[in-house]
């Protein structure tokens, strides 16, 4: 099935989803190592079998990742390589998704109750807004299809809603700073202790200076994951989740807390 889709001159949103599932064997949400090499090999074979040349985007992709063992791509990168239907592709090209800071601001707009997730109807409105900002409109049936596919692509725990880290896969890998924090997340007890330690005035939120102190300590303790030279970027992206400069416990937990235990 993946082979026939890779031979297509135009790949529909549902076909793109099937291709992704085929190659993301471990369900991590990214293609790397053998998964990525399998994609490159099968893409070249499928196009050759169909008598088709690789597109310029495909050639660039093969040149960039074909000889690398450390390559890693997300859904966004694949959507730019394959000839995906225009409106679906636009969801990965919108201005709000070109930087992590803009993404965080967009997230805050839709996660209005600070619950830490976006449900189906909110996701539908989010996608509709992205398309409208690109001067594109789709009918309700197509919008529902896109919403359903986005849930299938990003809802890794199948709870019918998207958490921040799941939704962040709409970002290109190099822009997704949340990946840096995946390996250093704390359990709920540790996180609460850290929050109370850095909320020095005990007002229930962390301001920019308090966040700066927290990030400096995290960088010192986790030098393999975090680069202290990037603190300004980390801080700017995280503060985009704040409410008027006030970063509440539930907001910071989206970045640093792994769970309740």
UniProtKB/Swiss-Prot annotation:
The modification N-acetylalanine is found at residue 2. Ca(2+) 2 binds at residues 111, 113, 122. SUPFAM superfamilies: EF-hand. CDD domains: EFh_HEF_CB. Residues 11-46, 53-88, 98-133, 142-177, 186-221 form the EF-hand domain. Ca(2+) 4 binds at residues 199, 201, 203, 205, 210. InterPro entries: Calbindin_Ca-bind, Calbindin_six-EFh_dom, EF-hand-dom_pair, EF_Hand_1_Ca_BS, EF_hand_dom. Gene3D superfamilies: EF-hand. Ca(2+) 3 binds at residues 155, 157, 159, 161, 166. One of its GO terms (cellular component) is nucleus. PROSITE patterns: EF_HAND_1 (PS00018), EF_HAND_2 (PS50222). SMART domains: EFh (SM00054). Ca(2+) 1 binds at residues 24, 26, 28, 30, 35. GO terms for molecular function: calcium ion binding; vitamin D binding. It holds the Pfam family EF-hand_1. Belongs to the calbindin family. Interacts with RANBP9. This is Calbindin.
């Amino acid at each position: 099935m993946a082979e026939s889709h890779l031979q297509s001159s135009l790949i529909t949103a549902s076909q793109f989803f099937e291709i992704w599932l085929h190659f993301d064997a471990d369900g991590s949400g990214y293609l790397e190592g053998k998964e990525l090499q399998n994609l490159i090999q099968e893409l070249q074979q499928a196009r050759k079998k169909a008598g088709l040349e690789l597109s310029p985007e495909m050639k660039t992709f093969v040149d960039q990742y074909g000889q690398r063992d450390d390559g890693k791509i997300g859904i966004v990168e694949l959507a730019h390589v394959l000839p995906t239907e225009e409106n679906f592709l636009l969801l990965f090209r919108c201005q709000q998704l070109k930087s992590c800071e803009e993404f965080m601001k967009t997230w805050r707009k839709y996660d209005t109750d600070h619950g830490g997730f976006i449900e189906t109807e909110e996701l539908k409105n989010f996608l509709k807004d992205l398309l409208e900002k690109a001067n594109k409109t789709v009918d309700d049936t197509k919008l529902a299809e896109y919403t359903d596919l986005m849930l299938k692509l990003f809802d890794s725990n199948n709870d019918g809603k998207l958490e921040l880290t799941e939704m962040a896969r709409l970002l290109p890998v190099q822009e997704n700073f949340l990946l840096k924090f995946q390996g250093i997340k704390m359990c709920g007890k540790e996180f609460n202790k850290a929050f109370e330690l850095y909320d020095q005035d005990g007002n229930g939120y962390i301001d920019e200076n308090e966040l700066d102190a927290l990030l400096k300590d995290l960088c010192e303790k986790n030098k393999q994951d975090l680069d202290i030279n990037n603190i300004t970027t980390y801080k700017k992206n995280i503060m985009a989740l704040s409410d008027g400069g006030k970063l509440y416990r539930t907001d910071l937990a989206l970045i640093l807390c792994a769970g309740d235990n």
